[in-house]
């Protein structure tokens, strides 16, 4: 047989033996396909041949997920990158959290009759993350939480007498006052009742936005008090600031620390400050910034002053955790036991004093001021 004819017939035979696969342009949802179970990629979707009635057709397809490798943005005390710092701080905390075993104890729970169990379950998820994170340093023999909503006032007053909760209240106030203070009721308080670490939380608010950080925030206060001692009440921004930072990091988890979630939360904290503090920060004057930072001790009192610490102290903590890691922050807390001076504490733990830190911190904080 002629060699050219043999080659032609061989090619024809091969082409007839192969199954016909339609071009990508013919692959679309609802179009006819030939064999059930086969797949075809068209554009950014993978289509599967399925049975629809008596016909074999392509399904709606599944979009291919695009995984973007995280970019490691270099940061330093002289380069507090606005994206790099939140990401690095978050990574440092979550790395520790993921390597921590589940704590071996559960809180004792007292729940008001009007509280919905599903709402409690939401809170416990964030609280358990805080328990696990701080367990190597703070592991009380007993820890109790009290969850209430409007309508549980009488029950809470009785429970207060039973558990000794009145020591956690501001002078002259009752738990009924606390429940009725805000609408909806979402406030919380942490402290020690009859030598037992305790926090009380009102759950009338939905588990959304900043309310997700409340449980981890309050539990961080218990860690601070136990591991750092009472000196924390006399130093600026640490108590509420670090509780704020670990509250939002553990409460919002898992989340993108450069997303609108963090931005919205910081906006709310900034807006809740007194106008004098807002004016100091907006002035972008370094001396006014330093003076304001030094006014943020818990003993100054008042919700507006607490909001200053929530905001600027949270950012200060974020920077320290990003640059020097989680373990160094724990060391910083331990040093508070014997050192009541912020400048000396920073020098002892991080190697620089208060003024130096504030000078480096200020531009990072100013950049977070809402437009």
Regions found by a protein language model. Name each.
Residues 4-13:
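Sec-dependent N-terminal signal peptides
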Residues 24-68:
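Tryptophan-rich substrate-binding surfaces of secreted polymer-degrading and adhesive proteins
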Residues 15-23:
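C-terminal segment of classical bacterial N-terminal signal peptides
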Residues 67-208, 212-213, 351-358, 364-369:
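Non-catalytic architectural context of zinc metalloproteases
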Residues 270-355, 366:
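Active-site-proximal alpha-helical
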Residues 131-139, 220-229, 247-255, 321-326, ...:
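Sec-exported extracytoplasmic/periplasmic mature domains
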């Amino acid at each position: 047989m002629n060699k050219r004819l043999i080659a032609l017939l061989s090619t024809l035979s091969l082409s007839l033996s192969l199954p016909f696969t339609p071009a990508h342009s013919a692959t679309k949802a609802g179009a006819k396909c030939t064999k059930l179970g086969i797949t075809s990629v068209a554009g950014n979707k993978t289509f599967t041949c399925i049975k629809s009635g008596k016909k074999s057709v392509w399904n709606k397809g599944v979009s291919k997920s695009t995984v973007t490798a995280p970019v490691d943005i270099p940061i330093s005390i002289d380069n507090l990158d606005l994206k790099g710092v939140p990401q690095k701080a978050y990574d440092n905390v979550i790395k520790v959290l993921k390597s921590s075993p589940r704590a071996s104890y559960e809180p004792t729970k007292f729940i008001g009759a009007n509280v919905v169990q599903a709402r409690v379950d939401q809170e416990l998820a964030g609280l358990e993350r805080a328990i696990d994170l701080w367990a190597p340093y703070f592991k009380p023999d007993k820890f109790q939480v009290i969850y209430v909503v409007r309508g549980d006032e009488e029950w809470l007053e009785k429970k207060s007498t039973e558990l000794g909760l009145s020591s956690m209240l501001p002078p002259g106030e009752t738990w009924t006052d606390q429940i009725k203070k805000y609408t909806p009721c979402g406030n919380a308080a942490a402290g020690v009742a009859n030598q037992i670490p305790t926090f009380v939380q009102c759950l009338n608010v939905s588990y959304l936005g900043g309310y997700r950080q409340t449980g981890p925030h309050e539990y961080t206060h218990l860690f601070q008090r136990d591991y750092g001692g009472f000196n924390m009440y006399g130093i600026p921004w640490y108590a509420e600031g670090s509780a704020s930072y670990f509250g939002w990091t553990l409460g919002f988890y898992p989340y993108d620390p450069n997303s609108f979630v963090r931005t919205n939360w910081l906006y709310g904290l900034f807006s809740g400050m007194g106008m004098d503090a807002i004016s100091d920060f907006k002035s972008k004057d370094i001396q006014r910034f330093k003076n304001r930072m030094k006014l943020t001790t818990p003993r100054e009192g008042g919700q507006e002053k607490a909001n200053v610490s929530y905001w600027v102290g949270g950012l200060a903590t974020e920077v320290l955790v990003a640059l020097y890691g989680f373990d160094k922050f724990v060391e910083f807390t331990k040093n508070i036991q014997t050192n009541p001076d912020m400048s000396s504490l920073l020098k002892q733990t991080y190697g620089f004093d208060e003024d130096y830190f504030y000078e480096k911190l200020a531009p990072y904080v100013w950049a977070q001021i809402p437009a």
